[in-house]
Amino acid sequence: MSSGIIFGNRILDVAIIACFLAQFYKVFAPMFKGKKANWVRLLQTGGMPSSHASTVVSLVTSIAILKGMRSTEFAIGMVFSSIVLYDATGIRRAAGEHAKALNKLVKSVERKDGLDKIESNFKEFLGHTPLEVFWGCVLGLATGIAFR
């Protein structure tokens, strides 16, 4: 296995590059709709494409190419990437939906009862739709193959 350029580990380098590409796309995606680049998105979760998906899929792709699909590293990567992908579309997405509902509920109670502002601005942009995860996987696969 050849050493990587960034961390001295080719597999880790590819995963970091895939994550960066996904996040970098999110910064400039608003420009396709005539809006300004949103640099805050570089460090936020959620959105298109899933950087979690691109990271773990590029990792597993690199392991498959460099170590083989019968390697222990590939097996470990597959198990953990499955957990990450499930978490992104299932648990984290549901948590984001719960946050939306709670934020609406708190605003409703504040208006109805005339209460002071309740600190409840729960983060709503957490998980991913299946389509966002799909495109993250495509980006991860392409990155893993491109940087083999």
Name what the model sees in each region:
Residues 1-24, 32-35:
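Helix-loop-helix hairpins and the membrane-proximal interhelical loops
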Residues 20-25, 38-148:
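Membrane-embedded catalytic cores of phosphoryl/pyrophosphoryl-handling enzymes
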